[in-house]
Amino acid sequence: MIREAKQEELQEVLNLYLYLHEENVPEQSEHLSVIWSQIIADKNHHLIVNIVDGKIVSSCVCVIIPNLTRNIRPYAFVENVVTHADYRGHGYATECLNYAKTIAVNNNCYKMMLLTGSKEQKTLEFYKNAG
C-alpha cells in the first residue's frame, strides 16, 4: 500500500533511512519534532511510503515548488529514494516514484526532477529505468 507518511511513523521512516546513507538515527529532540511536524503539515512536501505486511519498506520524498515561469506552473523535486535491503528488487521504490509522478501531475507540474548524489551504477541504472 502506498500513501503519505503519518505523524506517528517518524521512527519507522528514520529507521528506513539507515538504508539510504545515514549511519545512525537522530536522537529524539525538539528540533527533530519541529522538523517532522513541518514536513507532515506542508501541503507541498510529500513523504511517500510503501507498506508491505504492515512495515514501511520503501519511501521517497516529492516536493512541489511554486514557480512564476512556465505559465505559473510548479515543478517537482524527488529525493531520498530508499528501499529496505531485504525488500529490494520487487518494484517497491518504482511504485513510490509512480506515486510521486501522480502527485506532480495532479499539481500541474511542468517537470519532475529526481535528485541523487549516488555514484553507484546499480542506483543510476534504476533511476534511468524509472524515467
Question: What are these regions, as identified by a protein language model?
Answer:
Residues 97, 104-116:
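Conserved GNAT acetyl-CoA-binding A-motif
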Residues 87, 91-99:
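Conserved acetyl-CoA pyrophosphate-binding loop and the N-cap/start of the following alpha-helix
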Residues 37-49, 77:
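A short helix-loop-beta-strand connector motif used in the catalytic cores of GNAT acetyltransferases and
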Residues 49, 55-64, 82:
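Conserved beta-strand in the GNAT
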Residues 1-13, 26:
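A short beta-loop-alpha structural element at the N-terminal edge
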Residues 66-78, 88:
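A conserved beta-turn-beta hairpin within the catalytic core of GNAT-like acetyltransferases
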Residues 14-36:
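Conserved GNAT-fold acetyl-CoA-binding loop/helix
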Residues 127:
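Conserved active-site tyrosine of GNAT-family acetyltransferases
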